[in-house]
Amino acid sequence: MNNVPRVPADDVRASINNSAVEKDHAKLREMIVAYVRKTGNKAMACAEMTYQVELAKHQLVDPLPDDVKNKVVWRDTFWLPDEAASIYSKAQAVVSMECHSPLIALHNGTPAIYVRQPTDTCKGQMYRDFGSGDWFFEVDETSGEQLWSRLAAIQRNPAKAKSQARSIMRTVNQRQKRMVDVVRQTCRAS
């Protein structure tokens, strides 16, 4: 974060992230290769954070085989959430190593797979809490083949996957309403 002094934990987190960059992205590349070759569809590599724009190119796109790379669109600039939401709403699925893109996709009715990294905060637990456990993976406990298998299931039966995304959002909306009701009651009582 800008304007926040670094603490030793920041260096530990950065060291862990740096040591896992290739290994983690190799799993996503394996999934992308399988998706493109088996479906003939295009894939998009885009960043949720500004520092990830170049990272996506170097770690996801550049190492891909030429026959796959030709079907991968790399977003070379950072985008704002409303633009991401527009693209995600038209996507067959979203697969992300960041927490927020799957949420934006689900909100738009698009199936979304979240691949959590060990240095992410505990907020990733919310995916299991609101019913998206089938689409939640710990990067250290999964393979590119497992990611492709789950994505292939979405691709094979998009109606079922979209229904699951809507069900997840119903759960989210019910829980948000319940939370807001409790806050209102608490505010009225004070």
Predicted features by range, described:
Residues 1-190:
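Active-site anion-handling motifs in enzyme catalytic cores
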